[in-house]
């Protein structure tokens, strides 16, 4: 079985997806709560800071995946946000050229953590044992993160990788929620492409069975929570910045983006009665985790919100590791 190293591994979404397509591995995670969940789930785990490790510590790994925390690079076009982005893009270019990067920049969690996957990739290349496949994904600040992945792509192509970047919609990969994720897939031994959606995109007001007949319907909340009966979810976020105008979706639609605030979502019955809020297991189902996944530790809602949806992870890892002939076909 192919072996992977998973950086910023969280509770295990990337691992479960990777294992589904034949890639086993070990994850590095610093958060004690996420580590508790991983251990309970039987996932191979190193509890530590990815900055203290490197490829030499995991010599069997030929695949690298990562979902580095990407701090807010821009808030309302702030000068500080633009400067942070400029610093990161400059550092990516410098690292590719093997020139020194300001240690203060690398030590700043706002900028340094998003550079860690590149440090690992380049170190593996320079050691003569390069990763044959790379998968990077992130949900926060999608447009800004995509700039970083595009800068990574320029460096990796110079090193001989085939690279594809883009923004994917989770409901098109069998996840019962609408969410966009900025992704990068790369491989060293052949061409690569982003995974093709298997399901239709969600459009408000368009029936689940309508649209491109070549694709399967998106999944609704009711599809994975059939025991719940009829309900409407009321978002904890206001539409257009108006806290009084909270979005609503019925069980016949996908969930809103699952975030660390999912425990605040209200569920109401058709007659207006308040229903019990989502359990951790139910919230995990909306991210593609098994119903009995052993969520552990504290701040479980945040763990769930931070996780990579399992089905999307499987599609990404398969795209990066499938035989080259499949891509060419």
Describe each PLM feature range.
Residues 64, 184, 305:
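Short, conserved catalytic/metal-binding motifs centered on acidic residues
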Residues 221-329:
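C-terminal target-recognition/interaction regions appended to catalytic cores
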Residues 61-67:
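Short SAM/SAH-binding signature in class I
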Residues 4-54, 65:
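SAM cofactor-binding core of SAM-dependent methyltransferases
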Residues 19, 35-39, 53-61, 73-257, 321:
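Class I S-adenosyl-L-methionine
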